[in-house]
Regions:
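Conserved ABC ATPase signature
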Residues: 56-63
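Conserved ABC ATPase "signature" region
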Residues: 24, 36-52
């Protein structure tokens, strides 16, 4: 059987065939005798079991087409599935549907999935390992756990006079960025309590001060732009 499957860019569907017939044809292409049970299992898995069996792929929504494409890719039980931008153009429900299908394939069917995507917030919800690339070169390869543990904390400060506060913090070994309504401190030797003391000594009224973890998206851009 086909042990590697891929969906690159637009899925290759037979638009004049139903979902069932598309899957049946794919099994024939892989040299297998079409099995009704197997086709029904895949239709269930990708959420197309309740679609009108006469409905042709050309009349499917973008999300349905993408789910059928995944069905075609897994009908022959591959060990590795390669997906290129699998959620491009999908609405929030379509994105969640694809994410749920991929999680099932990974957890219940033990399929390794390699996803190339620019939508980092989505990768953050499903990936176990990352290969980060820039200009065609691999710049980092690591597990999600390792990357998460290395993500720095930043401190967010909001005061009555942010322009004055940033000068005081900068003079006290803080790397600061002034945002529209707050200050972001990304590197400092001070604790939050020490920052509060420094600002209060200088009669700065503090509205809020808290720690926030750098997001994976910020981590990625810092890594890529630092090169």
């Amino acid at each position: 059987g086909c042990k590697l499957s891929s969906i690159v860019e637009s899925p290759a569907l037979h638009l004049n065939l139903s979902a069932y017939d598309n899957l049946q044809y794919q099994l024939l292409l892989c040299g297998e005798t079409p099995s009704h049970e197997k086709i029904e299992e895949v239709l269930n898995l990708v959420g197309l079991a309740d679609v009108d069996p006469k409905k042709k792929a050309k009349d499917f929504s973008l999300g349905m087409r993408q789910r059928l494409a995944i069905g075609l890719a897994i009908i022959d039980s591959p060990k590795l599935l390669i997906l290129d931008e699998p959620i491009n153009g999908l609405d929030p429900k379509g994105i969640k549907d694809i994410r749920d299908i991929l999680a099932t394939l990974k957890n219940d069917f033990n399929i390794t999935i390699l996803i190339s995507s620019h939508i980092l917030s989505e990768l953050d919800l499903i990936a176990d390992d990352y290969v980060i690339m820039s200009k065609g070169k691999v710049i980092q390869e690591d597990s999600k756990l390792a990357i998460l543990s290395s993500l720095a904390n930043k401190i967010i400060v909001s005061t009555a006079t942010n322009h004055t506060a940033i000068e005081i913090l900068t003079a006290n070994n803080c790397d600061c960025t002034l945002l529209p309504d707050k200050i972001e401190v990304t590197n400092t030797t001070l604790t939050i309590n020490q920052m509060i003391d420094v600002l209060r000594k200088n009669q700065i009224e503090i509205f809020e001060i808290y720690k926030e973890q750098v997001s994976f998206e910020e981590y990625y851009f810092n890594l890529v732009e630092g090169r």
